[in-house]
């Protein structure tokens, strides 16, 4: 069976974005046409379906590296912030975009929070989480997409047929 580990991201992510858009698992918010995706960007994305592509990339990262949190995802999707005459520093992606996408993926039943421990807060006990991991339904979707693009991947990368 082909899994997410067998398919490169440049083939897998567009196919997963198309599957998620068809599946109605994710929907683009109204404000998504006006926001930048990171602090190092100057303008909003030019693609009309960028929300689905970002959600697919987030789901792929969770499937490969889960449990994973919002901060780690923001660092992974960030770039280099231009500081003028000063050296460039790492720029993080928008955490609001990542959180909203994760909330939509949770409502669709594709990812879930991983509880770690309960600590005592000012208002009583507070549940802490280690991040999010993929659910069985999410794994089924990801593996189904990976299996559907296997032939295209083998034609583009002939060495992958060994795996």
Predicted ranges, named:
Residues 57-65, 76, 101:
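Short amphipathic alpha-helical elements of helix-turn-helix/winged-helix folds
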Residues 122-163:
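Short, amphipathic alpha-helical interaction segments positioned at domain boundaries
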Residues 1-56, 60:
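Long, low-complexity, charged/polar intrinsically disordered regions in eukaryotic proteins
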Residues 106-123:
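A short, conserved structural fragment
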Residues 67-89:
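Short acidic, hydrophobic short linear motifs in intrinsically disordered regions
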């Amino acid at each position: 069976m082909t899994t997410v580990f067998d398919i490169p991201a440049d083939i897998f992510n567009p196919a997963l974005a198309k599957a998620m858009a068809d599946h109605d698992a994710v929907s683009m918010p109204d404000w998504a046409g006006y926001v930048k995706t990171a602090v190092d960007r100057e303008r909003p994305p030019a693609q009309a379906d960028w929300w689905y592509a970002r959600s697919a990339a987030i789901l792929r990262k969770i499937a490969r590296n889960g449990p994973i949190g919002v901060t780690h995802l923001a660092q992974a999707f960030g770039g280099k912030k231009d500081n003028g005459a000063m050296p460039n520093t790492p720029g993080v992606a928008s955490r609001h975009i990542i959180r909203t996408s994760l909330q939509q993926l949770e409502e669709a039943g594709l990812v879930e929070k991983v509880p770690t421990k309960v600590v005592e807060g000012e208002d009583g006990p507070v549940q802490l989480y280690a991040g999010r991991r993929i659910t069985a339904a999410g794994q089924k979707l990801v593996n189904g997409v990976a299996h559907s693009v296997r032939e295209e991947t083998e034609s583009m990368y002939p060495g992958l047929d060994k795996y």
